[in-house]
Amino acid sequence: MFHEIHRCQHADAPLLVLSSGLGGSSRYWADDLAALTRDHDVLVYDHAGTGRSPADLPADYSIRHMAMELLTLLDSLGIQRCHFMGHALGGLVGLEIALLRPELLQSQVLINAWSSPNPHSARCFSVRKKLLLNSGPDAYVQAQALFLYPADWIAANGARLADDEAHALAHFPGTDNLLRRIHALQTFDVEASLARIQTPTLLIANRDDMLVPWQQSQHLAEALPNARLVLLEYGGHASNITDPLPFQRTLLDFLNAQT
């Protein structure tokens, strides 16, 4: 899989691995790299079947497949210990890795994640799938901002959204791949295994997230043995983009306490 390691200026800096959400592209984290590389080496990657990691995903593709793909990459790089941060679907990958290879994770940060399906998110993804199948990629990509960002941020960032949408269409992963990734996140369920996860975990959620109710993160904070929740008031589903300073401050305070 395509990956990049952005190096900290300090020798022997701890490694932070970033896993993006449904879109799968490492580009999602671009606004955060300057802050994160002050104290950490940062590995970003394009998920299989997205961006610069072309692949035809199998019909039974799952979050476990995604976790195994990332573990294969980390093994190939000789990485034996790291911090992990995942956004939404990327957070599900983190939960799966915490079950498969707990000794790898020094800590994990899960942003607007969940442990099992919920009716609200299921409704959102049903609408998004219908848009993709009935109206095509252009309508799907244009609607994406409505699920990710607060209304005032969308109104103030038209030029950026136009650029992002043009990039998303130019690198569209294909309908089959996208539907299989959506199916993977819709069927993910590790509810019965949460008590086994001992990894120090920070859960970041947003009250105004339209796609994933913040109560999903609250439930994770209650069910994971070594977790705490920080609830941000503003930012939608992607507050690292829409309101980065509170997000980055919360994240770095946690990471620095773990290192």
From Swiss-Prot:
GO terms for molecular function: hydrolase activity, acting on carbon-nitrogen (but not peptide) bonds, in linear amides; triacylglycerol lipase activity. Its EC number is 3.5.1.-. It holds the Pfam family Abhydrolase_6. Keywords: Hydrolase. Disulfide bonds: none annotated. SUPFAM superfamilies: alpha/beta-Hydrolases. It is an enzyme of class 3 (hydrolase). GO terms for biological process: glycerolipid catabolic process; nitrogen utilization; uracil catabolic process. It catalyses: carbamate + 2 H(+) = NH4(+) + CO2. Transmembrane segments: none annotated. InterPro entries: AB_hydrolase (IPR050471), AB_hydrolase_1 (IPR000073), AB_hydrolase_fold (IPR029058), Pyrimidine_utilisation_RutD (IPR019913). NCBIfam families: RutD. Involved in pyrimidine catabolism. May facilitate the hydrolysis of carbamate, a reaction that can also occur spontaneously. PANTHER family: AB HYDROLASE-1 DOMAIN-CONTAINING PROTEIN, HYDROLASE, ALPHA/BETA FOLD FAMILY PROTEIN. Belongs to the AB hydrolase superfamily. Hydrolase RutD family. This is Putative carbamate hydrolase RutD. It comes from Pseudomonas savastanoi pv. phaseolicola (strain 1448A / Race 6). The lineage of its organism: Bacteria, Pseudomonadati, Pseudomonadota, Gammaproteobacteria, Pseudomonadales. The gene is rutD.
